[in-house]
Amino acid sequence: MSKEKFERTKPHVNVGTIGHVDHGKTTLTAAITTVLSKHYGGAARAFDQIDNAPEEKARGITINTSHVEYDTPTRHYAHVDCPGHADYVKNMITGAAQMDGAILVVAATDGPMPQTREHILLGRQVGVPYIIVFLNKCDMVDDEELLELVEMEVRELLTQYDFPGDDTPIIRGSALKALEGEAEWEEKILELANALDSYIPEPERAIDQPFLLPIEDVFSISGRGTVVTGRVERGIIRTGDEVEIVGIKDTTKTTVTGVEMFRKLLDEGRAGENIGALLRGTKREEIERGQVLAKPGSITPHTDFVSEVYVLSKEEGGRHTPFFKGYRPQFYFRTTDVTGTIELPEGVEMVMPGDNVKMTVSLIHPIAMDQGLRFAIREGGRTVGAGVVASVIK
C-alpha cells in the first residue's frame, strides 16, 4: 500500500492539552479526534490508543508523548498529549513538542488545582503564546453559579501569569459525553475547534523569520576568503546580504559574497538547509563555533538570563546527587558550551535530579539569545539538564 501524500494545502498548527491530572486531557484529545473525524474527515483515535503513549527521547531525556492529528475546514492540527505530569514538564522545557497554542483542561467539578497553576506558569516561562480553556465535566455540575465561579477563578489565574484572562475563550463541555456521541456535547467540541481556528493566529513559518545561522565550522579558502558552515535555523540568506556575527566577542558586520550547498553555488540558503556562507573581508581567527550569523539588529548577545530548567534523573543518565547555589556547569547553546554560574530562587537550597526549577544563569561569554531559546546543561560533555530562556536580564 502506497503512503498517502502529505497535503500541504492547509496551514499547519501545533497544539496540545495541558492541565491537572485526571481533569480529562486524554479523554478530550480522544473526543476531538472522534468528533472532528465525524464532521470533517480524518482518523478517530480511541482513549487507550492515546493513553499508552510511546516513549521518546528528546535531548537524551525520556518523555512519554502521544501525537494525534485532526483537521478543521481551514487548518491541519498536530496535537500532543502526555500521560503524566513529569512528561508535561519535560516536554514543555525541552520544546520536544513546540506548541503554537495550548488547550488548558479544567474539571468544573474541581476547579483549578496545583498542576493547573504549574502548567500555566510553565506555559508562560517556555513561551506558549496562546491558551484556550476547556471546562470539562460540565455535565456533572447543575449549578450555573458554580460554573461561573470556576470560570472566574481560571480567568484570574491566567491573568496572574500574564495571559489575557478576560479575553480567553472558555468552552464549557463534557469530553466523555462527546466521546459517547451525545449531540449537545459534540457541539461543544466543534465550538472548541472553532476557537482554535479563530483565537490562535497562523504561526509564522521559520522561513519568514529574520535570518539566523548557528556557526558550526569555519574554514579559510585561499584566494576566496573565510567560509562558515551550519544549518540555517530561520529565514533566508542571499548573496550580497549584510549580516552580523553575534556572540562570544563584540558584534561585527560583514557581507555574504557567496552561498553554497554540497560545493555548488546557490543564490540563497533557506531555513533547514545546511550551507556554507562566504564572508567578505573576515579573517578565519575572528570567527568561532558558537557564534551566529544573523540579520543585522535581529538578535543580541547576552550573558545573564532567567530560565526554567529540568534536571535529569539518575535513571536518565543525569546526576546522582543534588546541586547547590554556586554550581558551575556548561550551558550548551546551539553548537557550543559556555561555562556559567547559577542563582537559585529564594528558599531553594538545592536541586535534586528529576526536579524542575527556575534559575538565573550568568555566562562567562555572551551568547546570541532571545526568549524561548533551548539549551542543555552539561558536565564534561554529559547532559545533566535541559532548559529554556524565560527572559533575558543583560
Swiss-Prot record:
Record GO cellular component, one term: cytosol
Enzyme Commission numbers on file: 3.6.5.3
Pfam short name (any one): GTP_EFTU
Residues annotated as binding GTP: 19-26, 81-85, 136-139
Annotated segments matching region G2: 60-64
Annotated spans, G5: 174-176
Positions annotated to bind Mg(2+): T26
InterPro entries: EF-Tu_GTP-bd (IPR041709), EF-Tu_GTPase (IPR050055), EFTu-like_2 (IPR004161), EFTU_2 (IPR033720), G_TR_CS (IPR031157), P-loop_NTPase (IPR027417), Small_GTP-bd (IPR005225), T_Tr_GTP-bd_dom (IPR000795)
Region (G1): 19-26
Catalytic activity: GTP + H2O = GDP + phosphate + H(+)
Region (G3): 81-84
Main localization, broad class: cytoplasm
Location of region: G4: 136-139
PROSITE patterns: G_TR_1 (PS00301), G_TR_2 (PS51722)
Positions in coiled-coil regions: none
Superkingdom of this protein's organism: Bacteria
Claim: Zinc-finger is one of the keywords in the record: no
Subcellular location: Cytoplasm
Molecular function in Gene Ontology: GTP binding; GTPase activity; guanosine tetraphosphate binding; translation elongation factor activity
Alphabetized NCBIfam families for the sequence: EF-Tu (TIGR00485), PRK00049.1 (NF000766), PRK12735.1 (NF009372), PRK12736.1 (NF009373), small_GTP (TIGR00231)
Subunit composition and interactions: Monomer.
Function: GTP hydrolase that promotes the GTP-dependent binding of aminoacyl-tRNA to the A-site of ribosomes during protein biosynthesis.
Name of this protein: Elongation factor Tu
Organism: Actinobacillus succinogenes (strain ATCC 55618 / DSM 22257 / CCUG 43843 / 130Z)
Lineage start: Bacteria, Pseudomonadati, Pseudomonadota, Gammaproteobacteria, Pasteurellales
